[in-house]
């Protein structure tokens, strides 16, 4: 039973350095943006901010897509909105599964009633475009859906070649870029991506609670064939789609496109503070410049790997296709992984991640993302981890990790 007195205490969460696979510490500017005054959803200032967010995220996604907007909710809300709006019961979807979050795409597609074909890849590897093309020819899907950066394995699925395959065969291409966006290259138009969803809480350096989404014209047309305007706001000039209604009201992207469109057709009340956060995340990314931000994430990730290897630890997976921003490292046999994580948190205030499924208890996942993709965060984490490992009797090479990581910053 919760202590009743604590219910009335002012929130005072401890200071943490969040070096796991997400969420991470938000940029200070994002905290400041969230604290700004609330205004009404149809206030001209608010609709102006919404227009700005659309323009800013076209820059983040490297796209000219008109339909670029936010879905209110965590990153999973954007994933679900895309899949339930594109797929109807009986539609065929091809899903390369490179980790835990590929299985999530399967789960959502199954709930829609889609016919699913998976390409199951060993965890720690990625799916070759040739495999995708082979299955497209055999299976003839409406949609290929994949995860770009799967934090469960730390792998970064190459998308350019798969996009070319999908474009060549006339298949829609969806990508969950939650963990990869802003820390790894993501070129929506150039790579022929038709639908992409993301989140703020990783390399974009914000809190969880808003999902940026972008849709190609072709994808938006497919979704709008299922358009339904609610009774009570429907007017004579509103046209209904001629296809099956989208099964979810809240995640109906046809409705959400109308809400973000010129008519501002009522659907939900925009999460004002999260819109402020999303706007600031995009401004920070574009001000620093995509090339610079991604390079910062790459050097931070490479420095973390260098430090871990200098300790004598082994990193997980194919390093040629690892995300810039998350590293998997095998837990030394002689230590209890959860005990090390717990002491790292309690003594140093540093959080690193465990893992899922077949990797649970075998690797830690260490993130260098957003505001935490900085030299001091990398060095502090390595020094603290080394100290705790030595205390727990791990056979590591002491005094090497920080110097190895620093060498990448010289």
Predicted regions and their residues:
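Active-site C-terminal subdomain of aminotransferase-like
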Residues: 25-26, 201-306, 310, 410
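Conserved PLP-anchoring active-site segment centered on the Schiff-base-forming lysine
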Residues: 87-103
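Active-site phosphate-binding strand-loop segment of PLP-dependent enzymes
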Residues: 126-182, 195, 203
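Conserved PLP-binding catalytic core of the aspartate aminotransferase-like
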Residues: 314-347
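PLP-dependent enzyme catalytic core of the Aspartate aminotransferase-like
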Residues: 358, 362-410
């Amino acid at each position: 039973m919760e202590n009743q007195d604590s219910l009335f205490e002012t929130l005072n969460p401890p200071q943490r350095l969040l070096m796991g696979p997400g969420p991470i510490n938000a940029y200070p500017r994002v905290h400041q943006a969230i604290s700004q005054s609330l205004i009404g959803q149809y206030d001209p200032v608010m609709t102006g901010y919404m227009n700005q967010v659309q323009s800013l995220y076209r820059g983040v996604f490297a796209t000219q897509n008109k339909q670029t907007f936010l879905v209110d909710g965590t990153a999973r809300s954007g994933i679900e909105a895309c899949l339930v709006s594109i797929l109807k019961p009986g539609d065929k979807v091809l899903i390369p599964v490179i980790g835990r979050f590929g299985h999530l795409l399967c789960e959502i597609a199954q709930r829609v009633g889609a016919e699913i074909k998976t390409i199951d890849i060993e965890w720690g590897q990625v799916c070759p475009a040739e495999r995708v093309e082979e299955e497209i020819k055999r299976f003839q899907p409406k949609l290929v859906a994949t995860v770009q950066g799967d934090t469960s394995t730390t792998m970064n699925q190459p998308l350019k070649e798969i996009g070319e395959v999908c474009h060549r065969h006339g298949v829609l291409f969806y990508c969950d870029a939650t963990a990869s966006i802003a820390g790894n290259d993501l070129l929506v138009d150039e790579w022929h991506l038709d639908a992409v969803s993301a989140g703020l809480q990783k390399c974009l350096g914000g809190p969880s609670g808003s999902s940026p989404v972008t849709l190609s014209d072709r994808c938006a047309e497919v979704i709008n064939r299922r358009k339904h305007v609610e009774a009570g706001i429907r007017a004579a000039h509103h046209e209904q789609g001629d296809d099956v209604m989208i099964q979810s009201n809240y995640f109906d992207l046809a409705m959400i496109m109308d809400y973000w469109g010129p008519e501002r057709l009522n659907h939900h009340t925009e999460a004002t503070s999260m819109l402020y956060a999303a706007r600031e995340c995009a401004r920070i990314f574009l001000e620093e410049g995509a090339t610079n931000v991604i390079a910062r994430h790459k050097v931070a990730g490479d420095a973390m790997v260098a430090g871990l290897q200098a300790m004598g630890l082994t990193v997980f997976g194919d390093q040629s296709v690892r995300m810039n921003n998350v590293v998997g490292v095998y837990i030394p046999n002689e230590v209890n992984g959860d005990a090390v994580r717990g002491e790292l948190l309690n003594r140093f205030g540093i959080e690193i991640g465990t893992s899922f499924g077949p990797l649970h208890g075998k690797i830690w996942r260490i993130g260098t993302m957003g505001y935490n993709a900085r030299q001091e965060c990398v060095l502090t984490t390595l020094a603290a981890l080394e100290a705790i490992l030595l205390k727990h009797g791990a056979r590591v090479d002491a005094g090497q990790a920080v110097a190895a990581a620093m060498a990448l910053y010289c």
